[in-house]
Amino acid sequence: MRFKKSLTCIDMHTEGEAARIVTSGLPHIPGSNMAEKKAYLQENMDYLRRGIMLEPRGHDDMFGAFLFDPIEEGADLGIVFMDTGGYLNMCGHNSIAAVTAAVETGILSVPAKATNVPVVLDTPAGLVRGTAHLQSGTESEVSNASIINVPSFLYQQDVVIVLPKPYGEVRVDIAFGGNFFAIVPAEHLGIDISVQNLSRLQEAGELLRTEINRSVKVQHPQLPHINTVDCVEIYGNATNPEAKYKNVVIFGNRQADRSPCGTGTSAKMATLYAKGQLRIGETFVYESILGSLFQGRVLGEERIPGVKVPVTKDAEEGMLVVTTEITGKAFIMGFNTMLFDPTDPFLNGFTLKR
């Protein structure tokens, strides 16, 4: 048996959503920032993503990330996110997993008697400032982790999208929380958020994302490479009394987020804040389709003079952005050495999804 390549990974989940983090075995990936590394992987080495994410090593709802040395000043780790359909500029649940793994596996050293360990991630969407909160009396056991996300904002409000029957005309908000989201109430689609309705939610989410990218142009005003709606966030009434809403996010190749979605939580908080429905410092609890929870807060707001998006009323006053924090719990499930045999007919993975 002769192996073409081997990769080492940490297999984790954050509030139920998979996070397979590749820690070593990659060749040199060119790029002067994480966005360029992401683009290089996509254009030249996408077989790696497929082999790691898809069957038989992964599954149709797999998620993961590549770790790199950081490039941006002040960062501890570089990271590029991936799923079964491609790559994302940012991911909240996988950032929480990476922060947790960095501390619990010794990737980063932990100061003596520390209770909170800062971990700064260099992502394609910008710097994400994480904190691993340690269990009392331990040196590296993480009770949960928080991330301060990249600036988030409501981009466009009450966008009318026409879908095939039985959905018809649907109104959505478009917001950015590290990725662009189309945010839609479940009642507008006529579907309750439940595991039993998952296939219908996936179908509606994929239809909506396809149509919104066909009919609506989005462009991050400061990051030229971010110009598509990557995720559809369907929300409704919470089941858990602690939560404000329940949601499911559809992304990738009809993937459904098992966690409450970190970047989606930021996008939702930015939307609520812009509408006057959430205050700075107020706790916002978001529930997933599984019933797991993220805790979020808006930490502050800022106006960027001269920069505008469709909801900006006064270009001189500028675009409103908010700083958001998300907290959740990630678990290490195992350490994985992946072997790639050149004679394997499924070397680079496969999917049975159409």
Curated annotation (Swiss-Prot):
It comes from the Eukaryota. Pfam families: Pro_racemase. Its EC number is 5.1.1.4. Its main location: cytoplasm. Catalyzes the interconversion of L- and D-proline. Belongs to the proline racemase family. Homodimer. This is Proline racemase B. It comes from Trypanosoma cruzi (strain CL Brener).
